Amino acid sequence: MHRQSIVRLTRQCGGLPLVELPPPYLAPSLHFSLIRSPVQCSSFSSTAVAAGRERDLSKSRGVSAIHRTGPKFRLGVSKYPLPKPVSPDALEKRYPTPDHGLWGFFPKDKSALSTPEYDVAHGRSWSIQELREKSWDDLHSLWWVCVKERNRIATSNLERQRLKAGYGEWEANDRDKVIRVTQKSIKHVLRERWYAWEDAQRLYKNGYRPQDEDNQE
């Protein structure tokens, strides 16, 4: 029997006892409605609350500023006027520093790219025999001169790749190779001095004294 027909029949007869009802497997809704008490339920919504703002019922909701629709809520505005940019004529002129340290990343003429003639005009690398006669301060200064020159070459190569100049890459790389040979020679000389200092320290710990040999003579 259909559920609506059973419910209609129950209302007309003023309610049927459990004996007159059909079996539960035929009409489970009738048995559950008589046994269970009504449960209060509410609708579920995931929409956030409007935070105390009432709906304005505006038909122009979401219309852009092109249609001249003003804000729907009052906005706070500062009473101070907006700052105005200073005229370039009123600004104090600043002159560049001619001896600034960053000019070391550029050629002597302060151009963005070094010319092939400038990069190819270099001498040979320092030899190990020449560097052995230099002091620690001289080697330290020469090392940082090489570092600054390699940074300048790297800056020119990066700018050359950005501009896609198509020239000067071979000359710059050849100059960089000569500088790297000098740096390797400096490391070799410093390594020799380090080993010599270790040997002298080991001999001194073992009891060797140079003045003893002078006294024996």
UniProtKB/Swiss-Prot annotation:
Record-annotated disulphide pairs: none
Entry keyword Mitochondrion: yes
Entry annotated with the keyword Membrane: no
Pfam family, one: MRP-L47
GO cellular component terms, A-Z: mitochondrial large ribosomal subunit
InterPro entries xref list: MRP-L47_sf, Ribosomal_uL29_mit
Matching Gene3D superfamilies: 6.10.330.20
UniProt GO molecular function: structural constituent of ribosome
Keywords for this protein: Mitochondrion, Ribonucleoprotein, Ribosomal protein, Transit peptide
GO biological process: mitochondrial translation
Predominant location category: mitochondrion
Tree of life domain: Eukaryota
Location of this chain's protein in the cell: Mitochondrion
Family of the protein in this entry: Belongs to the universal ribosomal protein uL29 family.
PANTHER family, alphabetized: LARGE RIBOSOMAL SUBUNIT PROTEIN UL29M, RIBOSOMAL PROTEIN L47, MITOCHONDRIAL-RELATED
Subunit structure and binding partners: Component of the mitochondrial large ribosomal subunit. Mature mitochondrial ribosomes consist of a small (37S) and a large (54S) subunit. The 37S subunit contains at least 33 different proteins and 1 molecule of RNA (15S). The 54S subunit contains at least 45 different proteins and 1 molecule of RNA (21S).
Protein name from the UniProt record: Large ribosomal subunit protein uL29m
Organism: Aspergillus clavatus (strain ATCC 1007 / CBS 513.65 / DSM 816 / NCTC 3887 / NRRL 1 / QM 1276 / 107)
